[in-house]
Each structure stands twice: as structure tokens, then as C-alpha cells.
Amino acid sequence: MEAIVYTFLLVGTLGIIFFAIFFREPPRIAK
């Protein structure tokens, strides 16, 4: 059970950091 909890926390932290950077500096996609 602990492995699941640690994995959930790790994914959640990475997700928050990713979305924070993504919304702070939106990537400019060349069409």
C-alpha cells in the first residue's frame, strides 16, 4: 500500500509542477 501512496504523491507533484510551468509559459506551437 505504501508504494501506491508514494507513487500517487510523486505523480501528483510532477503533474502540479508541469501544469504550473505550462500555464505560466504557454508553449508557442508553430502551425
From Swiss-Prot:
Entry membrane topology: Single-pass membrane protein
One GO process term, biological-process aspect: photosynthesis
One CC-aspect GO term: chloroplast thylakoid membrane
Key words, A-Z: Chloroplast, Membrane, Photosynthesis, Photosystem II, Plastid, Thylakoid, Transmembrane, Transmembrane helix
Coiled-coil intervals, chain numbering: none
Coarse class of the protein's main subcellular location: plastid
Membrane-traversing stretches: 3-23
Subcellular location field: Plastid, Chloroplast thylakoid membrane
Signal peptide boundaries: none
Subunit text: PSII is composed of 1 copy each of membrane proteins PsbA, PsbB, PsbC, PsbD, PsbE, PsbF, PsbH, PsbI, PsbJ, PsbK, PsbL, PsbM, PsbT, PsbY, PsbZ, Psb30/Ycf12, at least 3 peripheral proteins of the oxygen-evolving complex and a large number of cofactors. It forms dimeric complexes.
Function according to Swiss-Prot or TrEMBL: Found at the monomer-monomer interface of the photosystem II (PS II) dimer, plays a role in assembly and dimerization of PSII. PSII is a light-driven water plastoquinone oxidoreductase, using light energy to abstract electrons from H(2)O, generating a proton gradient subsequently used for ATP formation.
HAMAP family noted in UniProt: PSII_PsbT
Family (UniProt): Belongs to the PsbT family.
Protein name as annotated: Photosystem II reaction center protein T
Organism: Ostreococcus tauri
Gene this chain is encoded by: psbT
